[in-house]
Amino acid sequence: MLVPPINLHAWVEQHRHLLKPPVGNKCIQQDGFIIMIVGGPNARTDYHYDEGPEWFFQLEGEMVLKVQDDGTARDIPIRAGEIFLLPPKVPHSPQRAAGSIGLVIERERLPHEQDGLQWYCPQCNHKLYEAMFPLENIETDFPPVFDHFYRSLALRTCMQCGHVHPAPERYAAIEA
């Protein structure tokens, strides 16, 4: 059975209250593709690794897509009304401004594919940690990996330069 068209602007207005931290991400359709609306602000320090391409359409406000490009960290600004197709296998970290809203489309993973979350040293860009896993639910599969990384001072300490990757405030008691 065909799903009727979705009025995207009306959907955003009706669900705007859900597009806020800590999650800020709502899947609106999933059938071959994962179609999400994502609101800002966010303060992600991880990089997502996807074996398929990801399509970004910035509806409101702006974002910066931080990417790891041949061992170099660089920023790709995406403003309201702009689209960007991220090629497969490019580690990326979406940084969304307060009040921003974007549409992200990813294809559903093939059975043999793994998603990944990676962290890089903010001082020297050395890879600190990477976890690969089969993605089943983007809203529930990421948090346990975040917890594992942020709760470990050893994982967050750069073996190359000694810098300690900061953890979000809710993990502050771990460092005490």
Curated annotation (Swiss-Prot):
Residues where O2 binds: 44
InterPro entries given in the database record: 3hydroanth_dOase, RmlC-like_jellyroll, RmlC_Cupin_sf
Protein name, UniProt field: 3-hydroxyanthranilate 3,4-dioxygenase
Entry note: cofactor: Binds 2 Fe(2+) ions per subunit.
Gene encoding the protein: nbaC
Binding site residues for Fe cation 2: 121, 124, 158, 161
Taxonomy, superkingdom: Bacteria
Function noted in UniProt: Catalyzes the oxidative ring opening of 3-hydroxyanthranilate to 2-amino-3-carboxymuconate semialdehyde, which spontaneously cyclizes to quinolinate.
A GO molecular function held by the record: 3-hydroxyanthranilate 3,4-dioxygenase activity
Keyword Membrane: no
Natural source organism: Xanthomonas campestris pv. campestris (strain B100)
Enzyme Commission number: 1.13.11.6
Coiled-coil stretches noted in the UniProt entry, renumbered to this chain: none
Cofactor requirement: Fe(2+)
Residues the entry annotates as binding substrate: 54, 96, 106
Pathway named in the protein's UniProt entry: Cofactor biosynthesis; NAD(+) biosynthesis; quinolinate from L-kynurenine: step 3/3
Keyword Protein transport: no
